[in-house]
Amino acid sequence: MDNQFIFQYSWEILPKKWVHKMKRSEHGNRFYTNTDYLFPLLCFLKWHTYTRVQVLIDICGVDYPSRKRRFEVVYNLLSTRYNSRIRVQTSADEVTRISSVVSLFPSAGWWEREVWDMFGVSFINHPDLRRILTDYGFEGHPLRKDFPLSGYVEVRYDDPEKRVVSEPIEMTQEFRYFDFASPWEQRSDG
C-alpha cells in the first residue's frame, strides 16, 4: 500500500467537513483541517485499518502575522505499518484553543507545551500546560514574529550582589516597524 492509495482512500471516506484541503507528494500526504475536527481526524488516522498512524514525530508552530488566523500548527505523523508520512495542519488565532492529543499520542505533551511556550497557542485538556523552554517569569512568546529581538528584560549575574538579576531593557528606539512582506513576492522591475 503506498501514499497514493492512502491519499485516495482518505479523500473518499473522510467527511468533507473534517478536511477542507488535501495535497499529495512523494514525501507524504497533507491534510488541512479546522481546529474543531483535528481530534477526530487524528483518531481516524491512528485507528483506521488503512492508515494506522502510530508515531507522532513532532508538532510544530508557524507564525504568519499577515493572516487572520496567524498561527499554523503542524502535526507530523508516521505509519510504520505502511511506511507512510502524513502531515496534518490547522490554523488558529491568539484566542482559539486547540484540542490536546495527549490522550492519543502521549509524546504530544512535550510538543504541545513547546508550541504554547514559543507561540502562545493554547491546548484544551492538556494535563500539564506550562512553560518548557523559557523561565516561569518570562513574558511573551519568543517565536512570534512581533516579539522584539532584544526581548523585554535583561537577565544577568550581578557579581557584587552574588545573584541573578532581571532588569528592564532600555532602548533608545521606542517604536520599530516590521515589514513582513517577502522580498521575493514583490513585483519585479524587468
UniProtKB/Swiss-Prot annotation:
Keyword Membrane among record annotations: yes
Compartments in which it is found: Mitochondrion inner membrane
Domain of life of the native organism: Eukaryota
Enzyme class per UniProt: translocase
Keywords (A to Z) from UniProt: Electron transport, Membrane, Mitochondrion, Mitochondrion inner membrane, NAD, Oxidoreductase, Respiratory chain, Translocase, Transport, Ubiquinone
GO CC field: mitochondrial inner membrane; mitochondrion; respiratory chain complex I
EC number of this enzyme: 7.1.1.2
SUPFAM superfamilies registered for this protein in UniProt: Nqo5-like
PROSITE patterns: COMPLEX1_30K
Entry keyword Nucleotide-binding: no
Known partners and oligomeric status: Complex I is composed of about 45 different subunits. This is a component of the iron-sulfur (IP) fragment of the enzyme.
Family the entry assigns: Belongs to the complex I 30 kDa subunit family.
NCBIfam families listed in its UniProt record: NuoC_fam, PRK06074.1-5
Protein name: NADH dehydrogenase [ubiquinone] iron-sulfur protein 3
